[in-house]
């Protein structure tokens, strides 16, 4: 049974991959949001949402391999991603169609160029998801924030629209070992172990970053997000 569900997962993305040429970018973004919601429903992943997003850089916490499905089910947007993903047969063309900011993480020149692009990014016209932690954190925790999105908001004048979301199943944790897990192994674990989870999502109040305030806003957002995570990200039986 789990093998059938795994095949459906790949069919899901293959279909999206084949549909890339037939939609405008805006139509494709709406399609992804619709499909992500259907995929979550199929796997009994109930998503509870409070609040509505406002225009700006979309900043969220990062815990699980399920995070991309959750955020795209709420609001489809691009993301900052390592350039290798662009060459993935299924995910690369889909991501490029949505609108990505590609970066070679081991290349200082590429990282600098990505920061410059981020500073000039129109976050209202082209929604962009950013995980300020830069990596996944353990279930119930929140890692330190990198300053990229906060500096970009300061330089561009765009608001930061934070989203904090909390799972109630520790098995979705992608950061407990402190090392990056293999994506495809995680997908196999999800189906083999029949992992189900609820997700509690909170659109927080947008934040303005004034001149010289990037660090201050980053610290304040981290403090606020951590309150939600420690309150709501708990195993279901706790």
What are these regions (language model features)?
Residues 12-22, 53-108:
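Catalytic core of membrane glycerolipid acyltransferases/transacylases, capturing the structured
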Residues 96, 118-120, 175-179:
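Short low-complexity, flexible loop/linker segments enriched in glycine and/or proline
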Residues 121-150:
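Catalytic-site beta-strand/loop segments enriched in glycine and acidic/polar residues
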Residues 1-62, 70:
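Membrane-anchoring hydrophobic helices of lipid-metabolizing enzymes
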Residues 101-122:
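A membrane-cytosol interface segment of integral membrane proteins
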Residues 196, 200-238:
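Long, non-transmembrane cytosolic or organellar matrix-exposed soluble domains/tails
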Residues 140-213:
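A cross-family acyltransferase "interaction/gating" segment
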């Amino acid at each position: 049974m789990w093998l059938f569900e795994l095949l459906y997962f790949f069919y899901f993305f293959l279909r999206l991959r084949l549909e890339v040429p037939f939609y405008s970018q805006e139509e494709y973004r709406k399609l992804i949001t619709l499909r992500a919601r259907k995929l979550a429903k199929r796997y009994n992943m109930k998503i509870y949402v409070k609040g509505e997003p406002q225009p700006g850089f979309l900043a969220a916490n990062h815990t699980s391999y399920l995070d991309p499905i959750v955020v795209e089910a709420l609001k489809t947007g691009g993301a900052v991603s390592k350039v290798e993903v662009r060459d993935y047969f299924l995910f690369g063309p889909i991501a490029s169609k949505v609108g990505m900011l590609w970066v070679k993480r081991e290349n200082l020149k590429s990282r600098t160029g990505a920061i410059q692009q981020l500073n000039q990014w129109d976050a209202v016209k082209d929604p962009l998801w950013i995980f300020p932690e830069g990596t996944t954190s353990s279930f119930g925790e929140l890692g330190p924030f990198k300053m990229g999105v906060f500096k970009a908001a300061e330089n561009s004048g765009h608001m930061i629209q934070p989203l904090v979301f909390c799972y109630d199943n520790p098995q979705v944790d992608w950061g407990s070992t402190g090392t990056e897990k293999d994506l495809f192994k995680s997908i196999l674990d999800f189906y083999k172990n029949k992992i189900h989870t609820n997700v509690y999502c909170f659109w927080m109040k947008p934040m303005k970053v004034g001149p010289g305030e990037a660090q201050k806003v980053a610290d304040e957002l981290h403090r606020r997000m951590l309150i939600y995570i420690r309150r709501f990200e708990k195993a279901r039986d706790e």
